[in-house]
Amino acid sequence: MYHLMLVCLGGAIGAGMRHLTVTAAGRALGTAFPWGTLAVNVAGSFAMGLLVEALARKFSVSNEIRLLLAPGMLGGFTTFSAFSLDVAVLWERGAQSAALAYVLASVAGSILALFVGLWLARSIL
């Protein structure tokens, strides 16, 4: 339960950071294009790569700190960072075909699922 609470705390911080970033980008660049979402996805993926490698090579931190930062804060900031890490892990393990299939299935499947959800909600409501 303690580990779950750490992930939740980090997630709350990350979600707040996401909101602030998306809001600031919308004010600065307009809302015709999702600049804020793009920014959090790219920045979150960069931060996930930096964090995972830094923790693995340079810094000895507890599992609790890892949970707070990676799935917690960065997961709340952007779930895209977790997806990007999954792709990188598959790729670096030599499973390039699986990594590419995962990218295609995730992107196409998520967009398709969104449209199915829209259709279902519009049909029911």
From Swiss-Prot:
Cellular component GO terms, alphabetical: plasma membrane
Cellular compartment(s): Cell inner membrane
Topology versus the membrane: Multi-pass membrane protein
Molecular function terms from GO: fluoride channel activity; metal ion binding
Tree of life domain: Bacteria
Reaction(s) catalysed by this chain's protein: fluoride(in) = fluoride(out)
Keywords: Cell inner membrane, Cell membrane, Ion channel, Ion transport, Membrane, Metal-binding, Sodium, Transmembrane, Transmembrane helix, Transport
Keyword Cell inner membrane applies: yes
GO biological process: cellular detoxification of fluoride
Family note: Belongs to the fluoride channel Fluc/FEX (TC 1.A.43) family.
Designated name of the protein: Fluoride-specific ion channel FluC
Organism in which the protein naturally occurs: Chelativorans sp. (strain BNC1)
